[in-house]
Amino acid sequence: PVNRRQRQMCIRDSIGCDTSQCGACVVHVDGNSLKSCTALAADVNGSKVTTIEGLETNGKMHPMQEAFKKLHGLQCGFCTPGMVMSAVDLLQKNKKPSDTEIRDWLEGNICRCTGYQNIVAAVKEAATKM
């Protein structure tokens, strides 16, 4: 699967655990987040699949990407695509989540670098712009 993604220039979604535990591979399928490492292409045939590359509009970053950048919601960047995609899905379903709701929603996305404080702050910032 990695070679196919690289050929299609969709290389920012990550495979971390390959067992659907870390969340680095999250993409949107028909607008809902899905851990792609354990999903078969046949399962999403005919669906709209969006990777982090698909969030930008006319070369401009999505508000969630801007917030992660502005508020340092990333360090090494490995988990960032999945974290951003999950956070966007959250805000599509809940426009003003509490800190607890954000943390609960993102519990399937593991980050070993940030301690999550800046990630939660970034999600709250993006909520004001989405």
Predicted features along the sequence, with ranges:
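Short Fe-S-cluster ligation motifs
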Residues: 46-74, 100-125
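Non-heme iron-sulfur electron-transfer modules
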Residues: 28-48, 52, 79, 90-101, ...
